[in-house]
């Protein structure tokens, strides 16, 4: 598992504005990872599948997260174009895969759809699809708790709870990220995994990004021509499995891999090594055959 420290990032000013990004340089091949809500470029869970395949990782902070202003790109298609410019700026003429995790899924789809000459493959993990999301009640509640004015208080309270009573804090958070009971999900995590999640949740911030994620978005799945791998769990409480089914139905060359995770963090499931092998095979497959 990745060490518990935030990775160093860089800021570059492109035509649309400043962009924060992390570049873990390895081999010539590169994947572009779009993280989900409350995340930024320097935060990550498990990217060993890319390291094992000698693949570099480029991870930009999406609009409103980290040090990328919400005005840079702003919309899903807009930031897809910003990312294409970032790739050109860094000298990447081909991207082995666009990887979209959770709320980063729509941007990965747009990146692949709008830049087929750049992006070779698409990987979507627990990703939002073309279905409406979230429901009205959740949208209103999230708008109150994670607006730019209130998100600091919300996350400050959560950090305090995680320091004082980490298991209680994890139960509260997992209740919204899993369909099984939170006590059951927590019991299935190892002590190291619990420590890792406490570390991750304690560093999350929403900035102006989460409210931006709640904006309506166009369905671009039918415009994706590249092969795609969609990874999803029926017990994911954050993103319903129906989103994965809609993605596979909409993307002409998509395959669905079902995770057995009890929650939104598939990297902690027992079948993650098997899924990682599938991802590695997908990344290294010959696309000309």
Question: Could you describe each region identified by the protein language model?
Answer:
Residues 262-276:
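Catalytic histidine-centered segment of alpha/beta-hydrolase-like enzymes
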Residues 23-69:
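Conserved HGGG/HGGXW glycine-rich cap/lid loop of the alpha/beta-hydrolase fold
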Residues 142-144, 148-220:
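Alpha/beta-hydrolase
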Residues 224, 230-232, 236:
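Short beta-strand/loop motif that positions the catalytic acidic residue
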Residues 100-104, 108:
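Gly/Ala-rich beta-loop-alpha elbow adjacent to hydrolase catalytic centers
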Residues 237-243:
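Conserved alpha/beta-hydrolase "acid-adjacent" motif
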Residues 78-96:
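Conserved acidic catalytic loop of the alpha/beta-hydrolase fold
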Residues 122-154:
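Flexible "cap/lid" loop of the alpha/beta hydrolase fold
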């Amino acid at each position: 598992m990745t060490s518990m420290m935030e990775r160093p990032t860089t800021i570059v000013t492109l035509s649309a504005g400043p962009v924060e990004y992390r570049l873990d340089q390895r081999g010539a091949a590169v994947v572009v990872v779009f993280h989900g809500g409350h995340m930024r470029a320097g935060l990550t869970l498990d990217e060993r599948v890319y390291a094992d395949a000698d693949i570099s990782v480029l991870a930009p902070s999406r609009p409103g997260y980290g040090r990328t202003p919400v005005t840079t790109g702003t919309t899903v298609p807009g930031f897809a174009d910003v990312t294409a410019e970032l790739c050109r700026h860094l000298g990447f003429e081909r991207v082995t895969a666009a990887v979209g995790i959770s709320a980063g899924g729509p941007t990965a789809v747009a990146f692949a759809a709008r830049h087929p000459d750049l992006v070779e493959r698409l990987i979507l993990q627990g990703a939002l699809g073309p279905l409406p999301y979230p429901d009205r009640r959740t949208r209103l509640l999230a708008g109150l708790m994670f607006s730019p004015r209130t998100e600091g208080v919300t996350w400050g309270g959560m950090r305090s709870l995680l320091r004082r009573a980490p298991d209680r804090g994890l139960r509260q958070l997992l209740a919204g990220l899993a369909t099984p009971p939170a006590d059951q999900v927590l019991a299935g995590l190892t002590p190291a995994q619990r420590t890792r999640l406490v570390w991750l949740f304690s560093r999350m911030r929403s900035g102006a990004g989460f409210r931006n994620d709640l904006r309506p978005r166009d369905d671009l799945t039918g415009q994706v021509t590249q092969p795609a791998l969609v990874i999803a769990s029926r017990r994911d409480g954050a993103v319903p499995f129906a989103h994965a089914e809609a993605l596979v139905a909409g993307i002409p060359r998509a395959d669905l891999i079902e995770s057995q995770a009890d929650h939104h963090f598939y990297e902690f499931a027992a079948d993650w090594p098997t899924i990682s092998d599938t991802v590695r095979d997908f990344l290294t497959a010959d696309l000309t055959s």
